[in-house]
Amino acid sequence: MAREWPMEQSPTLQAHLALQNADADCAAVIEALADAARELARQIAIAPLAGFDEGAATVNADGDVQKALDIVADNLMRDALRKAPVAGILSEEVDRPETVNAAAPLCVAIDPLDGSSNLQNNISVGTIFSIRPRGRDVLSSFFEPGTAQRAAGFFVYGPQTCLVLAIDHRVDLYVLHPTLREFVLARSGLRIPQDTPEFAINASNRRHWSGTVRNYVDECLAGAAGPRGRDFNMRWIASLVAEAYRILMRGGVFLYPADSRPGYREGRLRLVYEAHPMALIMEWAGGSASSGRSRILELSARSPHQRAPLIMGDVRLVRDVDQLHEGVEPLFETSDAPLFARRGLFR
């Protein structure tokens, strides 16, 4: 069970990392990211006044339309990381990794502003990062499996500005104190609540899903009268950091599967700087993360911006989805195919 820290006893991020004897290089990178996140939180707060929530008429390395604040966030994060012990940086906003100091011990993969399309709707957005050891060269460092990560985390810019940090096999929550302007420890040792009957998926894409995913969602929607024997709530925020935060606080399962649309057949989220860090956080908080067929942390990227499906959350609920995929040919079996017509977990 997570320990809650009263405000008057809460150590700062820097102090807590020192108390936990965190690796000095990792700590320096995390503190650099926190410095950038403080400024980014301020920029997000004034985005409608400064026009930062508008499009920048450009696309990033992966073909996504950029907001002006995407570029601001990328510059803030990379500028901060250049002052830390970092050999290379892989950002969602650039095509290839940037070499900073080839002799430094760490590399960082980052999505500087995840969910920026939500800015105009005043929905939480965030920064996701993965810290990993430098390999034989900067590029190859990002092609190691997710198990190689030294630390990972995400900032949430919402009602509070928070940092969820996975380091040394634990997950802690820090909140940006509005007066001190420091991240202070709010909860340590986060554990995902078990057996919460909630699932998150974008149901508008149902027609594009595999038969397996449709069958899983149908079983949840059938409720207490269906094969799963209980009522489920469905959630969808369309913000990866907000979805992950909710799972850490409430439990349940999040699904962003591959589907039949062009550009989605291998999943939509990026493996190195979205799925890998989220998987590390989930596992170290007692949960699980899968592609539906494989443990996310065991997957290795073949290209910097490779995509992957992501199912994460409560171990039991993730396992349920994995079991539905067993014996099913990848990847878009149809629900009216004879062998898989009504493959369900309970029949």
Curated annotation (Swiss-Prot):
Residue numbers binding Mg(2+) 1: E92, D111, L113
GO molecular function: fructose 1,6-bisphosphate 1-phosphatase activity; magnesium ion binding
InterPro entries attached to this UniProt entry: FBPase_C_dom, FBPase_class-1, FBPase_N, FBPtase, Fructose_bisphosphatase_AS
CC terms in the record's Gene Ontology section: cytosol
Presence of the UniProt keyword Signal in the record: no
Keyword annotations: Calvin cycle, Carbohydrate metabolism, Cytoplasm, Hydrolase, Magnesium, Metal-binding
Metabolic or biological pathway, per its Swiss-Prot or TrEMBL entry: Carbohydrate biosynthesis; Calvin cycle
Binding positions (Mg(2+) 2): D111, D114, E274
Reaction it catalyzes: beta-D-fructose 1,6-bisphosphate + H2O = beta-D-fructose 6-phosphate + phosphate
Localization of this protein: Cytoplasm
Keyword Hydrolase: yes
Binding, substrate: D114, G115, S116, S117, N202
PROSITE patterns hit by this protein: FBPASE
Cofactor (UniProt): Mg(2+)
CDD domains in alphabetical order: FBPase
Cofactor note as given: Binds 2 magnesium ions per subunit.
A Pfam family recorded for this sequence: FBPase_C
Catalytic activity, EC: 3.1.3.11
Record text on subunit structure and interactions: Homotetramer.
Assigned protein family: Belongs to the FBPase class 1 family.
HAMAP family per UniProt: FBPase_class1
Protein name in UniProt: Fructose-1,6-bisphosphatase class 1 2
Lineage: Bacteria, Pseudomonadati, Pseudomonadota, Alphaproteobacteria, Hyphomicrobiales
Gene: fbp2
